[in-house]
Each structure stands twice: as structure tokens, then as C-alpha cells.
């Protein structure tokens, strides 16, 4: 056994020494952008339209309205025509498909907002003559026979055109624009599909914005509405200004918050996004397409003001210079519409904003992008850009599909490390299987596990992949406010050692829930054990999902294949070796976890521009090391919520979780169990600093290298694995990915083994007391397989859900499913007057209270555990006043302990 451990540890320690030295960070080499032309859309001649409504219904792309100059060009004084026609392209992948006119809007419209929604496409506002704004809102959708229908939705409170808008988070947003020719700062939103009216939001700060760009995207904590660019028209003697800044609307605080100016990384000059369109990409990026050149545009729109001033100067002074200046301006104005397209310098790059690091970059360049007033919509895995103008007055008929993909490069050395690790874990399970043993060996390791190994195993089990991916991702996106929750693990260790451990050790139970039957009744035991099994299967699914995200991010292998592969390897090695294989596997994995984390911290700080000094400057400027939020808001992660929730949730885990309690029983004596609990608490406090430091390091690294982010990253929790793959030397990256797998396997294997213990002891042995050890062991191994497969199935389902933070999701599941268990053990040990029936009623009411809190209030999920425990104890105490039970409690509660 020692030789096997030495081999595994030596392999992972020596490997970094032979890994290649990392090259300096380069620009993003993993995202590729492809452009292709699809069927052109021509309306009334050979040209397309500008400012149309664009959306999708199913796989079809719809284009409605728009405007152009059909007969006489704008340069020759032509009149702009507005349209009501609706065109459809049924399949963008079929080169033979053409656009077909299928219906009409109730009125000609352009310069409004269009968004694709689950039931169709919504068209908001606009103008039909360039003067009068519309407040009407239309829903385009199909009936069962696929016929297009146009229904009217609640009208805007204020008629608008030339505004921006987006759909996300269950709301349609619009902001800015003109209201019958007057620029406004107004913003509105309407819940869709159940909204009955538009909600007026606070006006956005600063000057008005005409033709801004907008998108809905996640920031660190929630879905937000982003509004950037646009221009403020001439206001009296104040010149027009093309904006180079932007804001996002924070719905929780009901306020607009400024974002960084549009200065792409590596450049010094700000851009504008007037006439551009935005669309979300991945979990935290917004891609902006098209738009005008700031200098050219401001010069053109301010020409009337410049002419007015020049005429005043020429009339007042009658100098030759003043007259020549006036004539020069007139000539410039007359020539403005006659320049070639290149002269206008419309934006021909993808301008990309990252909501977490608050940075701008540009990516790719194509003449197909150099348009203003286009329409853009996501169709499948591509963005479709429709028409627009290539210069003032000239409409393009082009329709372009843009596809941005991420191509990971994992490399043979990384694969070698990862495969070697997985093989090593299977061999570890095989080693313990050959040693044989009875059911006591399978469930409790024969009581021969050293205290330090049990302590490391508890640590690896409780934190695991959530520590390695979710905590760094949380610190990267927010700050260190979750860290005090880990400190509460050490705080909770002391009451666990004093009040709980003696009961589990002296009663010599295999399943923690045996105690509940002795203290209360069989029904309580069975219900608690069943709820624990449900929670463990859910936890298995979540923890299985995390590394699968990592493997998908770094290798490109399909997420579902990764989930199945990860589940099968873990089930095999856990089923073979029992808890002893699990614990010694956790020891190996614990070393990899800690060593890999410390290496990553150093590498991230070294890779940040400015090194350690640059790292410190950024985290201080952006408040990334904030530990405490002293607000009394019970809806967010304030200090009080973190401490109260952390104490409750960790008390639940360390007093009612069979996975942890089983470790208490694997040591040779109670003193060893005490030391293992304290070791876990100390590791949780000090080692976890490294994982939060990783999050801060990821933030500083990518803030100084924003072009190296994956612009299509679908899950924020994959930021650390992406860094490993994209920045670390070959071999080192494989080692840290192996650490994520180590974290996962430690948790899942412990969960599987604990589920097998709970089912075999609490159900099988309970109803088959005469069953032999061999039969019990067979049932346990079969339970391992069944529970692992169930966890795998739920993980596959989870892959289809939109989860912003897996850490938050785990804490919510913990509170919902486990709070009642913690309440039962509290009642059993500290409330001798509560009998079995009162405890059962309290347990059920505690679980109900948590679910009611979840669905009827905005209370932070971190408080669910506290609410469940507190409710169950209060109800249990009240019921005990009316339900009296006589039962010997000798050795079963603290007052009657032996």
C-alpha cells in the first residue's frame, strides 16, 4: 500500500519538473470566427433595408419593416421609404433557400427594437415616417398550422424610435432613443410572457442616447441590461456627442451603474458604438457588430452647428479667412454623401465586452461587418446580420452568418497525466478489493484508518470539486465574502467533537441514522435515511457535472460523454474497494488538490501584468478581497447571512451527513476521530485561502489579458479549467485537471459508499436482520452501482439547465434537502422531552418551512439550513407539550449520556 501511494505521489510531484516552461501569454488563439454569406435580402430593387426588425421563430429568420431609398439615392435628394413587409428565410443552412414575403406589419415601421422570445418575435416602437414615434408593440408568432400571426401587446408608455433593447431574465428592456424627435433618457421593461404593462425604470444617467446598442447578459451575480454607445444630438449650442461609455441596470438596487469606456485592450483611443447592435455570447461576454466611426460621425452631425458658427463669424468680421472657412464647410457638407464606402470607416471588427473584468477587446476583422443600422439575431449556433447601410443612404442586401467557436488544445502530455491518474485510482480500488474483508471492512475500514488520513478524507470529501472550481469561480466573479463560511467549519468542529462524536462512537453505529431509531422510532430513521440518500444522489450529480464541464472546456469532448466517463470510473473504483479505498484515495487526491492550488496561485500572480505589485494594485482598486458585507439585507450574501448560514449548513453536514460521520467511525479510537475533525477544520480555514486566491488571481490575470478569455464560455464555473488549458505548460495543465478529477472522485466515491451504507444498514439489514455479511456486502456493492447511475442520470439532466453559479446551487440544495436532518439530531441530543412523534412532526414542518421560504420569499438560500433546523426544533418542542412519550433515554441524549 505504501509503495503504491509513494509511486502515485512521486509521479505527480516530479512531473512539473519536466514540464515545458510557459511562454508569455499571447492573444486568444482558441476562438475562431468564420463568416459566410447566405441568401441576400433585396426589397424594392437591388438593395436591402436599414433598421429592420429581425428575429427568429424556430429555425426561421424573420425580417420585418425597415427603410431605404428605392428610386432616387439619398445623395441626390431621394425620399426615404418605410416598409411593413415581413420576410422569412426558413433554413439558413440551405444554400438553395430564398427569402419569401409572408405577411405585413399593421403599419410601416423602422428604427424600433426587436427581440426573439420563446414564443416568437416582439417588435417594439419605431417610426413610419422618420418624424413620429410609435408606442405600439407587436408579437409575431405562428399557429399550429405554422401560419404567421401578428398580435398586439401592451403599448409603451412613451412612443419611441431609434432606441435599443434586449430580452433576458424574463424581461423585455428598451431604453434611450427619440420620442417624436426629442432625445430621451427613458428606460422601460415588461415581464414576458405574462406582463400586463411596461414598468418605468429610473432614467439612465448623463446625456440622452440615440441609436445606442444593448444586450442582456450575466454579470457576477445576476442578469443585467447593458446600454452602451449611441449619440446625443445637438442641443441648442451644445454639439452632438457620440458616446464612448455605457451603463448597466441593476434590478435589485434599481440603479444604473457605469461600466468602463469603450477603449479596447491595447489601444488608447475610445470608440463609439452608435448605430451598432449587441448580442450576448457565452455566460459573460457581449459582442457588438457594426457602427459608425466616432470622428467622421460627429463631424457630420455637427455640421449644421459648425455652419451656423462659421456664417456668424463671416458676417461679423468679413475676413477672407472666415469666408473661406465657411465655403470649405459648405463644400464638405455637399460632398459628404459622395465618398467611397471606405472613407466613412464604419466599424469592421467585433467589439467584445466582458462583464466580470469590465474590459473591452476587439476580435476578427471583416469588410462584411462594416455596416451600421443592421439587424442581428442568434439562429442556432450562429449570429445572422441582416442588411444595414455600408455608407449613409446606401443599403446593403447582404445577409451574413457569423460563427464563433472555441477550439481547445489539450495535448498528449496532458492526456498522459490524466489517464495515468485515472488508471492509478482504479488500481487503488483493485488493491483493496484483493485484500478482501467483511462488511465491517467495506463500511468502516475495519477501524484501522489513521486519524490524519481520516481528516484529509473528510476535507477532500466535503470540499472537493466545489472547492477546486466553484470557489475560485465565485471569488473571480465577486470577492471573498464567502470565505467566512469556511471559517465556520472550524468553529463547528468544537461542538461536534464535544456533543456529537461521543454518541456516534460509543453507540457503535454503522449508519448515523441508527441513532435516530434508538432515540425516536423506526419511522424517523427511515425518513431521515431516505432524505439523506436523495440529497447524496443530487450532490453526486452536481459534483459529477463540475469536472465534466472542465473536461469539456479543455478538450472539446461532448459534455454528456464526459459525465458518463467520469461516473463509470468512479463507480468502478469505489465499488471494488469500499471505504478504505475511498479514504486512501482521498489522501492522494488531497495532496494533489493542495499542491495544484498553491502552484496555480503563484502562476496566476506571476502572469498578471506587473507581477505581485500589479496583482495587489488591481485587487485593491476593484475591491476583490472584500471579506465582509455589513448590510442587513437578508436576500444577499451579507456577513450575517454568511455566518448564520455557514454555521447552520456546516452543522448539518458534520452532524447528520453519513458521508462525514462514516469517517468518524473509521479511526481506531475516539481520540483519533477528534484529531481528524480538527485537522479538517484547520485545513478548511487555511488551505481554502489558496482557492480564493486563485479566484482573485484569475480576475487580475484576465483583466490584464482580456483578449485571452474564451468569448464563448458557456459556464462561469469553467474559468479555472480554461486557464489551465490555455495558459499553463503541458503536463502542469494535465496535473491540475487531474486534481479536479481527484476532487470529484473523492466526493462521489464517498457519497456512493455512504449511500450504500445507509441503504444496506437502514433498509436492507433493518428488514433482513438475519442477512449474512456476504449478502449485505453484495447489496452494498449493487447499491453503489445504482446510486452512481442515478447520479449520472441527474447530471446529464443538469447539463441542460442554466445555472449561473454551481456553488450557490449546491448551497441551495443543501439547505432544501438536509436542514431537517440537522434538526433531528439537534432534537435527539439536546431536547430529551421531544419524543418520536413530536420529532417527526417537527422534521416534516422544518422541511416544509424551507420549501415555502424558497418559493414565497426572496430570502437568501444560505439561510435555508438555519430556517429548516430552527423551524423543526420549535415545532418539535411545541408538539412535545401535547404529545408525551415514555422511553428510556440512557446514553441517547446529552443529559442522559453514559
Labelled PLM ranges:
Residues 7-16:
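Bacterial N-terminal signal peptides
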Residues 407-898:
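Membrane-embedded helix-loop-helix hairpins and adjacent transmembrane boundary segments
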Residues 2, 51-52, 84, 440, ...:
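Short amphipathic alpha-helical segments
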Residues 4-5, 22-23, 211-213, 259-260, ...:
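Residue-level detector of intrinsically disordered/flexible regions characterized by low predicted structural confidence
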Residues 1-4, 833:
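Positively charged n-region of N-terminal signal peptides that target proteins for export
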Amino acid at each position: 500500500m505504501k509503495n503504491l501511494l509513494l509511486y502515485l505521489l512521486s509521479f505527480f510531484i516530479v512531473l512539473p519538473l519536466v514540464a515545458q516552461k510557459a511562454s508569455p501569454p499571447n492573444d486568444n488563439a482558441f476562438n475562431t470566427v468564420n463568416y459566410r454569406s447566405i441568401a441576400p435580402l433585396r426589397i424594392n430593387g437591388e438593395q436591402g433595408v436599414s433598421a429592420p426588425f429581425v428575429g427568429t421563430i424556430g429555425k426561421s429568420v424573420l425580417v420585418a419593416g425597415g427603410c431605404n431609398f428605392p428610386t432616387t439615392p439619398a445623395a441626390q435628394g431621394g425620399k426615404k421609404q418605410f416598409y411593413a413587409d415581413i420576410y422569412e428565410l426558413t433554413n439558413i443552412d440551405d444554400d438553395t433557400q430564398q427569402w419569401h414575403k409572408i405577411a405585413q406589419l399593421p403599419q410601416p415601421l423602422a428604427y424600433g427594437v426587436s427581440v426573439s422570445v420563446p414564443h416568437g418575435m416582439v417588435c417594439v416602437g419605431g417610426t413610419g415616417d422618420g418624424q413620429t414615434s410609435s408606442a405600439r408593440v407587436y408579437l409575431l408568432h405562428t399557429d399550429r398550422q405554422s401560419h404567421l400571426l401578428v398580435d398586439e401587446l401592451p403599448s409603451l408608455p412613451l412612443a419611441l424610435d431609434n432606441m435599443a433593447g434586449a430580452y433576458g431574465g424574463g424581461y423585455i428592456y428598451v431604453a434611450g432613443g427619440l420620442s417624436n424627435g426629442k432625445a430621451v433618457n427613458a428606460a422601460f421593461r415588461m415581464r414576458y410572457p405574462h406582463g400586463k404593462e411596461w414598468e418605468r425604470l429610473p432614467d439612465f444617467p448623463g446625456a440622452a442616447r440615440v441609436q445606442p446598442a444593448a444586450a442582456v447578459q450575466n454579470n457576477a451575480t445576476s442578469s443585467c441590461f447593458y446600454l452602451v454607445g449611441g449619440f446625443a444630438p445637438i442641443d441648442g449650442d451644445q454639439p452632438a456627442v457620440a458616446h464612448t461609455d455605457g451603463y448597466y441596470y441593476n434590478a435589485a438596487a434599481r440603479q444604473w451603474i457605469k461600466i468602463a469606456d469603450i477603449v479596447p485592450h491595447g489601444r488608447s483611443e475610445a470608440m463609439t458604438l452608435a448605430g451598432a447592435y449587441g448580442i450576448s455570447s457565452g455566460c459573460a461576454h457581449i459582442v457588438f457588430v457594426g457602427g459608425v466611426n466616432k470622428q467622421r460621425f460627429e463631424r457630420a452631425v455637427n455640421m449644421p452647428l459648425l455652419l451656423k458658427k462659421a456664417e456668424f463669424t463671416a458676417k461679423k468680421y468679413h475676413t477672407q479667412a472666415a469666408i473661406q472657412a465657411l465655403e470649405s464647410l459648405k463644400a464638405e457638407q455637399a460632398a459628404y454623401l459622395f465618398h467611397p464606402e471606405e472613407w466613412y470607416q464604419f466599424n469592421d471588427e467585433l467589439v467584445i465586452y466582458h462583464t466580470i473584468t469590465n474590459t473591452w477587446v476587439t476580435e476578427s476583422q471583416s469588410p462584411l461587418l462594416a455596416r451600421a443600422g443592421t439587424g442581428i439575431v442568434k439562429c442556432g449556433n450562429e449570429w445572422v446580420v441582416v442588411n444595414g447601410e455600408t455608407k449613409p443612404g446606401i443599403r446593403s442586401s447582404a445577409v451574413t452568418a457569423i460563427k464563433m467557436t472555441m477550439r481547445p488544445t489539450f495535448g498528449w502530455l496532458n492526456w498522459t497525466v490524466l489517464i495515468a491518474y485515472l488508471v492509478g485510482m482504479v488500481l487503488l480500488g483493485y488493491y483493496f478489493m484483493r485484500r478482501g474483508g467483511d462488511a465491517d471492512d467495506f463500511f468502516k475500514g475495519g477501524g484501522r484508518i489513521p486519524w490524519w488520513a481520516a481528516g484529509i478524507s473528510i476535507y477532500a470529501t466535503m470540499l472537493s470539486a466545489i472547492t477546486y472550481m466553484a470557489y475560485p469561480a465565485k471569488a473571480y466573479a465577486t470577492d471573498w465574502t464567502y470565505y467566512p463560511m469556511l471559517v465556520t467549519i472550524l468553529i463547528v468542529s468544537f461542538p461536534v467533537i464535544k456533543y456529537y462524536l461521543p454518541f456516534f462512537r460509543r453507540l457503535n453505529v454503522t449508519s448515523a441514522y441508527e441513532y435516530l431509531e434508538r432515540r425516536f422510532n423506526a419511522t424517523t430513521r427511515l425518513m431521515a435515511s431516505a432524505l439523506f440518500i436523495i440529497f447524496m444522489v443530487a450532490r453526486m450529480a452536481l459534483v459529477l457535472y463540475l469536472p465534466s464541464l472542465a473536461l469539456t472546456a479543455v478538450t472539446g469532448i461532448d459534455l454528456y460523454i464526459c459525465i458518463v466517463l467520469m461516473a463509470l470510473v468512479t463507480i468502478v473504483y469505489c465499488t471494488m474497494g469500499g471505504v478504505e479505498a475511498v479514504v486512501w484515495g482521498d489522501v492522494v487526491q488531497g495532496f494533489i488538490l493542495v499542491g495544484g492550488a498553491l502552484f496555480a496561485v503563484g502562476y496566476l500572480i506571476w502572469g498578471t501584468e506587473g507581477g505581485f505589485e500589479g496583482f495587489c494594485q488591481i485587487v485593491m482598486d476593484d475591491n476583490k478581497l472584500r471579506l465582509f458585507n455589513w448590510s442587513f439585507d437578508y436576500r444577499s450574501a451579507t456577513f450575517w447571512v454568511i455566518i448564520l448560514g455557514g454555521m447552520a449548513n456546516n452543522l448539518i453536514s458534520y452532524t447528520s451527513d453519513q458521508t462525514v460521520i462514516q469517517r468518524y467511525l473509521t479511526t481506531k479510537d475516539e481520540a483519533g476521530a477528534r484529531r481528524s475533525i480538527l485537522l479538517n477544520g484547520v485545513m478548511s480555514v487555511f488551505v481554502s485561502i489558496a482557492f480564493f486566491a486563485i479566484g482573485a488571481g484569475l480576475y487580475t490575470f484576465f483583466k490584464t489579458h482580456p483578449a485571452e478569455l474564451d468569448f464563448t464560455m458557456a459556464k462561469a464555473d469553467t474559468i479555472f479549467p480554461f486557464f489551465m488549458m490555455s495558459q499553463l505548460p503541458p503536463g502542469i495543465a494535465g496535473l491540475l485537471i487531474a486534481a479536479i478529477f481527484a476532487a470529484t472522485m473523492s466526493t462521489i466515491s464517498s457519497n456512493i459508499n455512504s449511500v450504500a451504507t445507509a441503504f444496506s444498514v437502514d433498509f436492507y439489514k433493518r428488514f433482513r436482520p438475519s442477512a449474512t455479511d456476504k449478502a449485505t456486502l453484495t447489496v452494498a456493492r449493487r447499491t453503489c452501482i445504482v446510486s452512481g447511475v442515478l447520479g449520472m442520470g441527474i447530471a446529464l439532466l443538469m447539463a441542460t439547465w442554466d445555472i449561473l453559479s454551481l456553488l450557490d446551487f449546491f448551497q441551495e440544495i443543501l439547505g432544501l434537502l438536509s436542514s431537517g436532518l440537522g434538526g433531528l439530531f439537534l432534537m435527539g441530543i439536546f431536547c430529551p422531552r421531544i419524543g418520536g412523534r413530536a420529532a417527526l412532526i417537527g422534521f416534516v414542518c422544518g422541511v416544509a418551512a424551507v420549501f415555502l421560504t424558497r418559493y414565497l420569499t426572496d430570502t437568501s438560500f444560505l439561510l435555508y439550513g438555519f430556517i429548516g433546523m430552527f423551524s423543526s426544533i420549535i415545532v418539535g418542542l411545541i408538539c412535545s407539550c401535547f404529545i408525551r412519550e415514555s422511553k428510556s433515554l440512557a446514553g441517547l441524549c446529552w443529559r442522559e449520556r453514559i
